[in-house]
Amino acid sequence: MTEIEKEEACSRLQQHYAQVLSLLGEDPKREGLLKTPLRVAKAMQFLTKGYNEDPEAILRAAMFEEDYQQMVIVKDIDFFSMCEHHMLPFFGKAHVGYIPNRYITGLSKLPRVVDVFARRLQVQERLTTQIKECIQNTLNPLGVIVVIEAQHMCMQMRGVEKQNSLTTTSDFTGAFEESTTREEFLNLIGRRR
């Protein structure tokens, strides 16, 4: 999306958010809300900017040949996303591991991949799988594992209203299908089951 397209989209979003405020019984022209439609439009563009980014290109930009075939883990990756069902935030930590098969990537690239997929309207299950598949398809490692722990505002602010609930998802390929390899990963991230 070009800058002009982004500005046009922001302007249209701003108009729609002003209408939403009116439909909720608010006056979008009152002092406290004058800039709210623009702020919300910009926030939504930021929170969904992952649609305009290529996560595989991020990994390929720092892909190196290396003779290392032990686990590589980046844990406690903070992320936030938006639930596609209610458009409310969910946030938490992602733990990503892979066992290289000739290629490694820059360590900072794994959190960047998490962010690209998280900054879209999501469900946690799909987010977990998309991260795993991106790493598997790009690096072709011996195995990939992703564990995500998150709090969902759609469960805490509305619906069942369970403030201390935590949702955990995992997905894995290759070498991580072996329970001992998975157990090693879980021990290393401090999530032994």
Curated annotation (Swiss-Prot):
InterPro entries: GTP-CH-I_C/QueF (IPR043133), GTP-CH-I_N (IPR043134), GTP_CycHdrlase_I (IPR001474), GTP_CycHdrlase_I_CS (IPR018234), GTP_CycHdrlase_I_dom (IPR020602). Its EC number is 3.5.4.16. GO terms for biological process: one-carbon metabolic process; tetrahydrobiopterin biosynthetic process; tetrahydrofolate biosynthetic process. Keywords: GTP-binding, Hydrolase, Metal-binding, Nucleotide-binding, One-carbon metabolism, Zinc. Zn(2+) binds at residues 83, 86, 154. One of its GO terms (cellular component) is cytoplasm. GO terms for molecular function: GTP binding; GTP cyclohydrolase I activity; zinc ion binding. Disulfide bonds: none annotated. The keyword NAD does not apply. Pathway: Cofactor biosynthesis; 7,8-dihydroneopterin triphosphate biosynthesis; 7,8-dihydroneopterin triphosphate from GTP: step 1/1. It catalyses: GTP + H2O = 7,8-dihydroneopterin 3'-triphosphate + formate + H(+). Belongs to the GTP cyclohydrolase I family. Toroid-shaped homodecamer, composed of two pentamers of five dimers. This is GTP cyclohydrolase 1. It comes from Porphyromonas gingivalis (strain ATCC BAA-308 / W83).
